Amino acid sequence: MRIHYIVRPLALFCIMLYTVSAVSSDKYRWTDELVLLRAIDRLPEYRDGCHVEQFSSYDRTWGNDDGFSGKYSYLRKENGGLVIAEMEGAGVINRIWTPTPNDNMLSFYFDGKSEPGLRIRFSDLFSGKVFPFVSPLCGNEVGGFYCYLPITYARSCKIVMEGEGLQFIQIQYRRLPGMKVETYDGTFTDADRTLLDEVCRAWSAARPDAMAFAQGRSSGASVSEKTVTLSPGDGSVVFESGSPGRITGIELDGGNAFEGNDRNVILTARWDNDSTDAICAPVADFFGYAYGRPAMRGMLMGRSGYTNYCYLP
């Protein structure tokens, strides 16, 4: 079993974080949001001064018509189109999801302008054919069609679909009050293209690698490796540290020992002399097995080959 971790003075870290945040005065671009899609080291960071909200086709009567009829899939009809979302104030669209895309055109009207700043077929948000809406940030898997490409706006955004109908839809956005946000304009520098390519490579990595995320606040990671043999009823401490820091990755190679329905090997962890476990789960459950077999292989958690991995910091 391999544990990737870092040890560092957390007080200094907090001071550095505050200083960087306080002195930033540049406009917030879509690429500032894009870089967060690979900044796994920042997952534990609390966000303040923003609000995550969503437009969706949920049944306003709390029934089961969450998009089947299309009755709740838009806010209003306007000039022959359907207004499906309308956001006031600075913000960023983080996610668009649907299981039922169509080829109707979408128009994104930014900052109260009468002409759209972005026009694209609804289906091309997910097809991977239109830059920068490329795979794997945009695509379709079990569960529907998704787009995680950030779309920023300085003052407002209205999304209008041309056509008569729409079914299931979710549009998730984050309001950024008081921030100087640069509106997405569809122009891209060489640096923008390079960053997008780097994020796409991180999302599509063929093999999990903890050191790929040992950057930023997770840089300087060390590795602790231990081999254990467990008999029924036994337990073994595989990692222990008496200094502040963070675990940046857990890799556990157990062959096929965790397969099957028994789920009788338990992983536990606790921090800071707590009397209660922060983690207490069957190994199989922790790494995403289902019905006794490996069932998950994501960027941050799952199983690849015989390696069970978790890179949540």
Region roles according to the model:
Residues 1-10:
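Bacterial N-terminal signal peptides that target proteins for export
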